[in-house]
Each structure stands twice: as structure tokens, then as C-alpha cells.
């Protein structure tokens, strides 16, 4: 995935399915300068991690 698409997903009112290493995640925010996004596993909303945006996949 790229930064532009992450920003589109963040501003969308629709639920868009995204995975990180095969795990469904919710994107919390993105840091365009660093190329990372803060995400959490949809089953564990209190466990936010930073991941490389290019590792995110839209399903």
C-alpha cells in the first residue's frame, strides 16, 4: 500500500478491509514523512503498533 491510499482509507466513511501480515487491522493514523502507520488488530484495539505502510494490504 502507499501513503496516498492510507490517507484515503483514513478519510473514508466506509469500512475498508486492510491486513498486516495476514491479520485484519484498523489504521489509526499515518506518518507520511516516516512511511509508517499506527494500526491495531481488529480483535485487540488497545494494542497499537507502528508498521511500514508498504506492508499493509487492502483486501
Curated annotation (Swiss-Prot):
<keyword id="KW-0749">Sporulation</keyword>
<comment type="similarity">
    <text>Belongs to the SspH family.</text>
</comment>
<dbReference type="GO" id="GO:0042601">
    <property type="term" value="C:endospore-forming forespore"/>
</dbReference>
<dbReference type="GO" id="GO:0030436">
    <property type="term" value="P:asexual sporulation"/>
</dbReference>
<dbReference type="GO" id="GO:0030435">
    <property type="term" value="P:sporulation resulting in formation of a cellular spore"/>
</dbReference>
<dbReference type="InterPro" id="IPR012610">
    <property type="entry name" value="SASP_SspH"/>
</dbReference>
<protein>
    <recommendedName>
        <fullName>Small, acid-soluble spore protein H 1</fullName>
    </recommendedName>
</protein>
<dbReference type="Pfam" id="PF08141">
    <property type="entry name" value="SspH"/>
</dbReference>
